[in-house]
Swiss-Prot record:
Disulfide bonds: none
Stored InterPro entries: bHLH_dom, HLH_DNA-bd_sf, Myc_transcription_factors, Tscrpt_reg_Myc, Tscrpt_reg_Myc_N
Keywords recorded for this protein, A-Z: DNA-binding, Nucleus
Protein name: Protein L-Myc-1b
GO cellular component assignments: nucleus
Source organism of this protein record: Danio rerio
Protein's UniProt keywords contain Kinase: no
Region named Leucine-zipper: 373-401
Length: 404
């Protein structure tokens, strides 16, 4: 046919031009020195790693001129198309006339060219051929071509039998059963609800407030597609309160001191009213019977006797008061010590004009100064004795002079 041959030649010419234009990006025979700065492709080393080849030809143009080939030629073309992957790995070497005229084949209508599942169309064709085998030869339209094309009256009146071409079962061709740790999908029905995430609550009944609520989301890829899948997604719908405790964390343990006090107070509340014998310093034999947890050691018993008139709240208040008193006394002691060091520094002659003298230096200088003071004290004591003796001599001489 002149129209088909002209279109096929144009397609082949366009493919060869595209092949020549991008061939130096993928092969080693291109001179990089000549076209180094003109090329916008990545470095050649990257393409060597992937070993890329030219892309396959585009979808064949459906020219509606002429009539389709005979069923025998169509079957031969389909077998050649299916066996091509095992023989070749490069460009598709198909006859352009057969490719353009074979519009009634189900292979050309598969998901690679028309974006829908080929297995569904094959099932449809097989079911229609089994039910309408007598009427299929008289129909003027192919079953695999959309019905909104008005110019398909001159096409072939019969489709290729998929059972004669495809040997694998049609019902399970494109359906897979995917199952992971938290995902399960089956092909029993299109409207089946698939539980994607399953959360098992192993916590107490008091934590059911923080439970995760499943949300059903309907996803529809095509508005005209009757298939619909529902997914259960577990969403944690709790507000983020960063001050609150985590729902998965266990309650914090109280300090051991408070535990002991609680164990001591609980038997005391459950026991009978106290008797005056409890005031004695020695533990009575009734005390261990009333509080078995405290009877382990005598120290616990004495502690129990001392802590009876106070509750945990009052004991906490007493601890706070003791801590405050201790801090006040410690602060006062430090202030007194600092003031005394300053007074000692002022007494040393060499450190009066040194306000930032360390305490060690103050103590060393004070020791040396104290030793000098002791030496001077001894000297002055000796001088005092000498002066007293001299005074005694002078008084005796004066008395002798008066007698004379």
């Amino acid at each position: 046919m002149p129209g088909i041959s002209a279109s096929a030649s144009r397609i082949k010419k366009w493919e060869m031009e595209e092949y020549d234009q991008y061939q130096h990006y993928f092969y080693d025979d291109h001179n990089l020195d000549e076209d180094f700065f003109k090329s916008t492709a990545p470095s050649e080393d990257i393409w060597k790693k992937f070993e890329l080849v030219p892309t396959p030809p585009m979808s064949p143009v459906r020219i509606l001129e002429g009539s389709g080939p005979s069923p025998g030629d169509r079957l031969e073309w389909v077998s050649q198309f299916l066996g091509q992957d095992d023989e070749q790995e490069g460009l598709c070497k198909l006859n352009a006339e057969e490719t353009l005229e074979n519009l009634s084949s189900i292979i050309i209508q598969d998901c690679m060219w028309s974006s829908f599942s080929a297995s569904q169309q094959l099932e449809k064709v097989v079911s229609e051929r089994l039910s309408c085998s007598a009427q299929s030869k008289l129909s003027g339209k192919a079953q695999c071509v959309p019905a909104d094309v008005p110019a398909l009256n001159s096409l072939a009146t019969d489709c290729v039998d998929p059972a004669a071409v495809l040997t694998f079962p049609l019902s399970s061709s494109c359906k897979k059963q995917v199952s992971s740790g938290s995902e399960s999908r089956t092909d029993s029905s299109d409207d089946e609800e698939i539980d994607v995430v399953t959360v098992e609550h192993k916590q107490n009944k008091s934590r059911l407030v923080n439970a995760r609520k499943p949300v059903t989301i309907t996803v529809r890829a095509d508005p005209h597609d009757p298939c619909m899948k529902r997914f259960h997604i577990s969403i944690h719908q709790q507000q983020h309160n960063y001050a609150a405790r985590s729902p998965d964390s266990y309650p914090e343990e109280e300090p051991p001191r408070k535990k002991i006090r609680q164990e001591i107070v609980q038997p005391r509340l459950a026991s009978t009213p106290q008797t005056p014998e409890r005031k004695s310093p020695l533990p009575s034999p009734s005390v261990p019977a009333q509080s078995p947890t405290v009877s382990a050691s005598p120290t616990h018993t004495s502690y129990h006797l001392k802590s009876q008139p106070s509750s945990p709240q009052s004991s906490d208040c007493e601890d706070t008061d003791k801590r405050k008193t201790h801090n006040f006394l410690e602060r006062k002691r430090r202030n007194d010590l600092r003031s005394r060091f300053l007074a000692l520094r002022d007494e040393i002659p060499g450190l009066v004009d040194c306000p930032k003298t360390p305490k060690v230096v103050i103590l060393t200088k004070a020791t040396e100064y104290l030793r000098t003071l002791h030496v001077s004290d001894r000297q002055k004591a000796q001088e005092k004795k000498q002066l007293k003796s001299k005074q005694q001599q002078l008084l005796r001489r004066l008395a002798e002079l008066k007698r004379a």
